[in-house]
Amino acid sequence: GQIGVVNFWATWCPPCREEIPGLIDVQKRLGPQGVQVVGVAIDSADKTREYAANIGINYVIVLGTMATVDLVRELGNKAGALPFTVILNRDGAVSGTHLGLM
């Protein structure tokens, strides 16, 4: 399995936008070694698609729903704040979380 870096973000979130270039770099450098970044956008499809294309995001982006906010809270982010990053080990288990800019 791969190591997963799951980043919950939104286009309207300044710290989210600030950390995306670093996530692009992680995917570029560590992707070949089995690291997969996945962005979960809490936003509209149109805004997400446009932003991802403009900045050149090189990793998978999926759209979250209101259930995503519940998931974030279950993972320890009680405020539901963004950005929020979850690290998954090669077995798919949560090995760490980080709230805020990385």
Predicted feature residues:
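Short active-site neighborhood of thiol/selenol oxidoreductases, capturing the structured segment around
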Residues: 1-14, 23
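Hydrophobic beta-strand anchors of alpha/beta hydrolase catalytic cores
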Residues: 5-6, 37, 85
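Conserved hydrophobic/aromatic "anchor" residues
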Residues: 8-12, 51, 58-59
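Active-site-proximal beta-strand/loop segments in catalytic clefts of secreted hydrolases
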Residues: 8-9, 40-43, 64-65, 101
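Proline-centered helix-kink/hinge sites
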Residues: 14-15, 21-25, 60, 83, ...
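Structural microenvironment flanking redox-active thiols in thiol-disulfide oxidoreductases
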Residues: 17-56, 66-73
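Thiol/disulfide oxidoreductase modules built on the thioredoxin-like
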Residues: 53-58, 64-102
